[in-house]
Amino acid sequence: MPRSNRNDNFIDKSFTVMADLIVKLLPINARAKEAYVYYRDGLSAQNDGDYAEALENYEESLKLEENAIDRGETLKNIAIIYMSNGEEERALETYQKALDENPKQPSCLKNMGLIYEKRGRTAEEEGRRDDADGWFDQAANVWTQAVRLNPGGYLDIENWLKSTGRSNVDVYF
C-alpha cells in the first residue's frame, strides 16, 4: 500500500490529496506521474525518519523520472539521508550526481561544504594542519559556488568565508 494511503497526519494527508489532484490534472505522462508518487512517498518516509523506506521509494522514482531537475532533487534527498546516517563519502558522491543532473542546487554545494569543513575541523583537532587547510579550501570552493547561486541566502557561510580569509570579493553583491 502506498505510504500516502496510510498517512495519519492531517496536514500531510491534505497535502497528499491536493498534490494528487494537481498531478491528475497536469498534462504529464503516466511514467512521470508514477515517478512523482514514488518521490512523494519517499519524502513522506524521510520526514518520518524511515530512511530505508525513503531510499526504496527514491530509487524507484529515479528509475522512472526523466526530468533532470526532478532527478537532481531526488538525488539530493538521497544524499541528505546518507549524510544523516554518517555516510559522508556516499553523501558527497550522491550530491555530485545531483549536481550533474542539475548544477543549480546551492543546497547540495552547501551540504558538501559542511562535510569538508567538518573534516577540516577534525584534522585541525588532530594537529594535521596541512590536511585541515586542504579540507577548509574544499569547503570554501563549494561554498563560494553556493553563495554565487544564492546570494544572501547563506549569511553564515559568507561570514565563515570572510572570517577565514577565503572569500572572493566578486562573490558578494
From Swiss-Prot:
Protein name stated in the entry: Photosystem I assembly protein Ycf3
GO CC annotation: plasma membrane-derived thylakoid membrane
Swiss-Prot/TrEMBL keywords: Membrane, Photosynthesis, Repeat, Thylakoid, TPR repeat
Domain of life: Bacteria
InterPro entries on file: PSI_Ycf3_assembly (IPR022818), TPR-like_helical_dom_sf (IPR011990), TPR_rpt (IPR019734), Ycf3/AcsC/BcsC/TPR_MFPF (IPR051685)
One of the protein's GO biological processes: photosynthesis
Extent of the TPR repeats: 35-68, 72-105, 120-153
